[in-house]
Each structure stands twice: as C-alpha cells, then as structure tokens.
Amino acid sequence: IADIEANKDKYTAIGTEAIKEGKVAALLLAGGMGTRLGSDKPKGMYNIGLTRDVYIFEMLIKNLMDVVNQTGAWVPLYIMTSEKNNDDTVKFFEEMNYFGYDKNYVDFFVQEMAPAASFDGKIFLEDKDRISTSPNGNGGWFISFVKAGLCEKAKKAGVEYINIFAVDNVCQRMADPCFVGAMIDGGYRSAAKVVSKATPEEKVGVLCLEDGKPSIVEYYELTEDMRYQTKADGELAYKYGVILNYLFNIEDLEKNMKNNLSVHIVKKKIAHIDENGNAVKPETENGFKF
C-alpha cells in the first residue's frame, strides 16, 4: 500500500494499456432491493439527489464513464440482478438510455437463489405455493456468470481481469487504471481495494491474514479483542476495511470452480407466512439466509 502513491503514474500507464487492449471488465453486484432505504425497488434505482434526481446506478455509470474518457476505451460491464429485481433493473437502464453508456458493452444476468430457513431448520414459505428464497450471496456471482454464458463471452472478447464491485458505494472507482496496473505490475492474481477504518467500532468487514492466507472477517465476526487490537505504532491491527471492490484473474476463477466454497450463514429478519397463511414481518432476526 505504501508503494502505490510513489508508483501511481507507472501503475496507471500499465492499467490504461490493459483497458485499451480490452483485457479489463467490470461486474456490478446489484441483486439487492432498497428495503433498508425505504424503497420496494432495486437498490440501484434509489434517488440520492438533493436538488435534482440522481440515482445510484447513474452515479456508478458516471464513475465508470470517467475511466472510459480517461483511457479512450469502453469497459465491458456485466450487471448481476436477482429474480426479484431483474425486470425493473433492465427496464430502468433502457428508460434512462443506459445513462450514456454504450449498451453494446452491457450485459445483465440473474443471480442464483437459495432458500431461507428458521433457526430450527424449517424452510419458510413466501406464499402458500412458494418457498421463501433470497439471492445466494456475493460468493455465488461467478457460477451465475458462467451459467449465463458470459464467462465464455468475456474470454472470447479478450477479457483477462474482472473488477467486481457492489451497488452500495457511489464514491468508488471501478476498472481504476491505477488499481489494475498495480496488480498486473506486482504479478498478483487478485487484489482488493480497502479503506482505513475510522473507528474500531465501524461496521465494516476487514481484510487480514488467516493462517497466512488473505481472508475477510465480517464486522460482526470480530471479537472484542480483535476489534481494539493495535500494532506497535498504535494503528489498529485490523484496520483495512473492505468496500467490496475486487480484481480477479478470470483464469483463476475458472480453476477455483472445482473447489466448493463453504456456505456462509447469516442471521436475518425473514418475512414469511405462518401455518395459517398470515403474513409475518419480524422485527428481530428470525432465521438464516445462505
């Protein structure tokens, strides 16, 4: 991290060349709904403007357009939606004329779903004839990407690196030439953008080494000791907050498909119907999502 500022120009030049050669693509994880924002629409459709309409999707596309203008090359953009928001998302992009992005470089695909269960292992019902499901988490994006035929399409187009980013952060830069160049120049097979935690209590996952291997520990998994642990210089030992902005080599992703990831179980508030068919909207966590 200390070398980035000193080598910024070199990294940017390397990354710019890779983008011009069509080796870099961006992939937006946008399967979520804006429920916590008080919206029943896809999270990316949420209007964050103060004096005019400005949408989350719009800001993300604007950020990517900055890279297009900087490098003079379009970056292939893949947008992962979910069963619950795909139609609204695609329609919104069409209505907004893709916010000025060349639609020939944009592909949508739908994330796999997983059932939701109660704490005692019973499957919830969303309706009388439909079990309750939710998107299967960020870790499932690549399987969905492959099943949609987009991995093969990307490889045929010459894509070697995919920058994964989430819909939540409108300030982030994706397909960042400096970020791309730093990974290529260092000979790394993957990379992550991080920000320093503002306080020990900040609710953000952290990037760290676990048994000598890069790992992410979610904020709710940090023990009290880990949260406040400091190094000799007084800085937090677990300070590198992840913002869900990763760069991967596409060949490595294909190789790793042979390895099954462990299921990450998360406690959530899950709306469902009870045995009498009445709608239940819990105020506290009542089950697991996977």
Model region roles, listed by residue range:
Residues 23-27, 44, 74-79, 105-107, ...:
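Beta-sheet entry/capping signal
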Residues 98-99, 103-203:
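Conserved beta-loop-beta/alpha segment of the NTase-like Rossmann-fold superfamily
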